[in-house]
Amino acid sequence: MAAQLLEEDVVTCSICLGRYRDPVTLPCGHSFCGNCIQDSWRSCEKSCPECRQPFPEGAKLSRNVKMSTLLQALPVLPAPPAVTPRRDSATSHSARCLRHGRPLEFFCRTEGLCVCSACTVHDCSHHERALLDVERRVREDQLRARVLVTQQQVAQAETQLQELQEQRSRIESSACTLASVVSRRFSSLLQALEKQQASTLSDIEVAKKQALGQVLNEKQRLTDHLRALSQYDQSVQDLLAQADDCIFFQELQQLPEPTESLGPLTSPQWNEEQQLSNVNQLLSPLCELLLEEKSLPKVAAKAADAGPLETLGPLAPVPSAVCPLRKKLWQNYRNLTFDPETANQYLHLSHKDQRVTHHFQAQGPAKSGSFELWQVQCTQSFQTGQHYWEVRVSDHSVTLGVTYPKLSRQKLGTHTDNIGRGPCSWGLCIQEDSMQAWHNGKSQRLRGLPGQLLGVDLNLTSGCLTFYSLEPRTQPLHTFYAVFSQPLFPVFWLLEGRTLTLCHQPEATLPARPQEEATAPS
C-alpha cells in the first residue's frame, strides 16, 4: 500500500494533482504535464512552479520518456467516489497552491488569498499572514459580531416602525378630533353670525317700517286736510252761486269755519348714517379679522390711544422691484383726473388735470363748487367693484381719502381739512413726523412714515379701503372696513408748496359709467 502511494506521488503532476499526461521535464529536473506547464506560463513568468528557477530563454521543453513509459505500465485507477465537502481543517488543507502545488496552509491578509508555505517564502514574505484555521476563527468571530449588530439594528428598526405606526394612529386621531372641534366651532360662529345678520336686518326692517308708518300717517293727515279744504272750497263756491239773498244768509250762518293750517310736517325718524354706523361697528372688527391679508407685514397700529410710540422714521430701504402684490393691484388700475370745479383757489391744476400744486397766492376767484379748504376732488367716482390708483407727492403734509358726494365745501371746526372728520369720508393724513387714519372724527395713530409714492385700493365688494406705501417697497399702511352705500370720490388735501400727481398707466381703463362711475357733484 505504501509502495502504491509512493508510486502515485511520483507520477502526480503538482499543478493539476492528477497523473502526468504527456510529461515534460524542465532543466531543474521537475516534471509536469505538458499542457499544465504551458497554461501556467501564460499567466505568469516562465519559471518552475516548484523551485521558481527561471526557464532559459529560447530553450525547449524535453519530453520525459521514462515517465511516459512508467505511466503506461501502471494500472488505471478507478474514479474516486464523490464526497461531500466538509468545513474542517483537513479538507481545507487538501487544496493545493496553483503556483507551487503545495497544500494551502496560510492566509495572506495583505492579498486576501489562501497561500502555501512556498508563497510565504517567495511571494508573501513581507505580507501579514495567519494560519487558515486561525484566520477562519477570526473571520467567523467578525461575522458573528456583524450578525449581532444586524440583529440589534433589526430590533431597533422594528421598534421604531412600531413607534411610527403608533404616532400615525395618534396623529390621525388627533387631527380627526381637532377637525371636529374646529368644524363645530366654525359652525357655531356661522350660526351666531347668521343670527346677528338676521337680527341686524330685522332692526333695519323695523326702523324702516316705523319710518314708513310715520310717512303714511303724515300722508293720511295731509290727505284728510286736503279733502277738508276741498269740501270747504266747494261749499263756498256753492254759496257764492246762490241767487236768493235769504237763502244765502241762511246758509252762510251754517257754513263751518275754515280748516286750520296743519303746520310743519313731522319728519320720519329715519337716520341712514346711524344705521350704517351701527352696522359698521358690528362688521368692522369682523372684517379686520377675516379679510385682512395675514401674509403681508402690518404697519398700522391698532389704536390711537395706545400711549407714546417708538421713534418714527422712514421705512428701511429695500430693492424697489415691482412685487407680486403691486402687480395684482395693477389689474384694477384706474387713471384719475382732478375736477377743476372743486379745486380750492390756491390750488393750480396742470398736466391735463393730473397734477395739483399749492401756490402761496390765489389762482383766481373761488368757484361755487370749490372747497374752502386746500382740497380738490377727482372727477371719477366708484360705487361697485374694485379700483386702485397711485399718487406721487413731493413731500409729506398731505391727506389722501375718499368721500361721498355730500362732503362739505366749508371749513368745519379747527381742522385744516375735513377728510375723515365726518361719517361720509375716510382719510389718511401724512404729516412730517406722524401719520393718522381718520373717519367720523376719530383718528388712529399709525407707526412709521411712508415714501413719496402711495397707492389706494378701494374694494367695494368686500367693503375695504387700503392705503399702501410703494417706496421703497409695497406694504399696507392702514385698512378701513365699512359698508359703503353711496358713490365714492377720491379727494386730497395738500399743504402750501406741496405738489401731488395722479400716476397714469397706459393700459388702465375706467369701468362703465352706469355701473361703477358717478358724475361729479355740482
Swiss-Prot record:
Annotated Pfam families: SPRY (PF00622), zf-C3HC4 (PF00097)
Gene Ontology terms: biological process: antiviral innate immune response; negative regulation of inflammatory response; negative regulation of NLRP3 inflammasome complex assembly; positive regulation of autophagy; positive regulation of interferon-alpha production; positive regulation of interferon-beta production; positive regulation of protein oligomerization; protein K48-linked ubiquitination
Positions carrying Phosphoserine: 187
ZnF (B box-type) ranges: 92-134
EC number assigned by the record: 2.3.2.27
Gene3D superfamilies: 2.60.120.920, Classic Zinc Finger, Zinc/RING finger domain, C3HC4 (zinc finger)
Consequences of knocking out this gene: TRIM65-deficient mice show impaired NLRP3 ubiquitination and enhanced NLRP3 inflammasome activation.
Protein name stated in the entry: E3 ubiquitin-protein ligase TRIM65
UniProt cross-references to SUPFAM superfamilies, sorted A to Z: B-box zinc-binding domain (SSF57845), Concanavalin A-like lectins/glucanases (SSF49899), RING/U-box (SSF57850)
Zn finger region (RING-type): 13-52
Superkingdom classification of source: Eukaryota
Chain positions found as N-acetylalanine: 2
Keywords: Acetylation, Coiled coil, Cytoplasm, Immunity, Innate immunity, Metal-binding, Phosphoprotein, Transferase, Zinc, Zinc-finger
Coiled coil: 141-229
Protein family per UniProt: Belongs to the TRIM/RBCC family.
Subcellular location: Cytoplasm
Function description: E3 ubiquitin ligase that plays a role in several processes including innate immnity, autophagy or inflammation. Negatively regulates miRNAs by modulating the ubiquitination and stability of TNRC6A, a protein involved in RNA-mediated gene silencing by both micro-RNAs (miRNAs) and short interfering RNAs. This ubiquitination results in the suppressed expression of miR-138-5p leading to increased autophagy. Upon enteroviral infection, promotes 'Lys-63'-mediated ubiquitination activation of IFIH1/MDA5 leading to innate signaling cascade.
Catalysed reactions, as listed in the record: S-ubiquitinyl-[E2 ubiquitin-conjugating enzyme]-L-cysteine + [acceptor protein]-L-lysine = [E2 ubiquitin-conjugating enzyme]-L-cysteine + N(6)-ubiquitinyl-[acceptor protein]-L-lysine
The organism of origin for this protein: Mus musculus (Mouse)
